[in-house]
């Protein structure tokens, strides 16, 4: 197993990045079932813990995290790197010579994710992530965000051949 902790962005990573709005203003997001299986079953069965950090706030995200048994999810966080430093203290994480937290993986898709990505030993990106994020990634999924990219990253981290 390459990482003990997997931190995930939501919009554009766990979803396709689109927000669907109903007539009454209700928001909808779609999540991939394969990503859910990777988060709920595969990664924890290999001894890993999944954490969600997202800049937006949504009851939808809270519901999905609860459904997948993600105990640590943080919404409305614009400075994700700062949140990682807080988590590093909580979990007593160590850094390598490059200043990256050991045994920590992050997957994100847009420029807001770059500062936290640079702090993680393993950095994943969906195929359709922004150009800048793709440059920082150590793993680029063959799948788009919201279409199994997270599952593919989890399989990579767990050493599962696909």
Regions found by a protein language model. Name each.
Residues 1-78:
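Alpha-helical substrate-recognition element adjacent to the catalytic core
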Residues 28-29, 67, 81-162:
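Mg2+-dependent phosphoryl-transfer enzymes with acidic/Ser/Thr/Gly-rich catalytic loops
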